[in-house]
């Protein structure tokens, strides 16, 4: 039985009631775990206090990495989260992110998927470093047609070599998407259905299990 995980929830409000709304929506949609973006130890403690048997909660901190030095400096400082994700905007930073031991996954905006070339894939493969793509980024891109072309060109090829994680990037419970919606979109874009299922279950679960 697959355990579906939304790997990227970005609450705009960290009150207990707001987080419970995300948990209830996760249950409704069929998720068993959420990975929630945080920026402080206080947020991390609140999220951990709400984690339960029905929906497990994990924390993540995303570094907006515009340079290797910025990425290295910030990743050394962050201590109060389960996972550190590097969102990369250029090739040099993406290559460093693939090598740093304290980076758990690499997030690439859809318009930057050309960064996932053979050299980058090989570096990520050696470290078993997953690639994350946000569902919401696809629909908020300025050029949807070009984004679809990039997904077809780079993501389908990479999916046979490195683990890929699809996340919602939802800021409100209403922005969350069901596993079925995720599968439908990426199947239309040309990804194998079984691999798409892995991207919202097996691949994020494998990463989370390493935290135990």
Can you describe what each PLM-predicted range is?
Residues 1-34, 42-58, 69-81, 92-212:
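Charged catalytic cores and adjacent phosphate/nucleic-acid-binding surfaces used
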Residues 60-62:
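Regulatory helix-to-disordered linker/tail regions at the edges of structured cores
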Residues 65, 86-88:
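Short beta-strand elements of ligand-binding domains
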């Amino acid at each position: 039985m697959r355990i579906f995980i939304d790997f990227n929830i970005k609450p705009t409000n960290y009150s207990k009631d707001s987080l419970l709304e995300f948990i209830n929506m996760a249950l409704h949609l069929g998720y068993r775990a959420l990975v929630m973006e945080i920026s402080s130890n206080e947020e991390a403690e609140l999220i951990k206090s709400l984690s339960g048997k029905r929906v497990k909660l994990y924390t993540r901190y995303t570094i907006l990495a515009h340079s290797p030095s910025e990425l290295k400096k910030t990743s050394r400082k962050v201590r109060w989260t389960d996972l550190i994700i590097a969102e990369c905007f250029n090739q040099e930073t993406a290559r460093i992110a693939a090598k740093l031991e304290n980076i758990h996954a690499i997030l690439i905006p859809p318009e930057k998927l050309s960064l996932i070339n053979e050299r980058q894939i090989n570096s990520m493969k050696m470290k078993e470093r997953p690639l994350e793509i946000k569902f919401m980024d696809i629909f908020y891109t300025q050029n949807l047609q070009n984004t679809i072309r990039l997904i077809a060109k780079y993501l389908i090829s990479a999916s046979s070599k490195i683990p890929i994680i699809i996340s919602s990037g939802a800021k409100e419970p209403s922005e969350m998407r069901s596993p079925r919606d995720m599968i439908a979109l990426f199947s239309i874009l040309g990804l194998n259905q079984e691999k798409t299922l892995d991207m919202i279950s097996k691949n994020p679960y494998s990463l989370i299990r390493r935290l135990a």
